[in-house]
Amino acid sequence: VHRRFEILGTPDGITVADDFAHHPTELTATLNAAMKMGFNKVWAIFQPHTFSRTAMLLDDFAEALKIPDQAIISAILPVRETNTYNIYSTDLGAKVPGSVCLDTFEEITDYVCKNAKEGDLILTMGGGNVYMCANMIYKQLKYMEENK
């Protein structure tokens, strides 16, 4: 099924995958499964989808994002909303100890590619265009592997 734990590849021993999970229940189920798969470290890169959903489910998202070894939170994808909720990805990050908030996919790609190790799982999650970040990470890791 497209965008359900879809594995892009394993460049340099680092597995890159993408999942459509965009609700706390889906995040929890997917992350609990990932944590049982034997990876050295599970990285969850989450793109919150809409300001209203993020505001309404903030605490539930935070609980889900405490499951992986490392949570990275991108900027909230507004879709057709304006931020009348005055909520930001850093509000979610503040509730997830050790999380990192990075606005752009470029920043996330740089951070992950500098810090991920062989045996890790990089899992992008969200209902928006975060799959593009998975593609960027995969391509950068592949490039690094080929140019050692």
Language-model segments: residues:
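ATP-dependent carboxylate-amine ligase
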Residues: 1-148
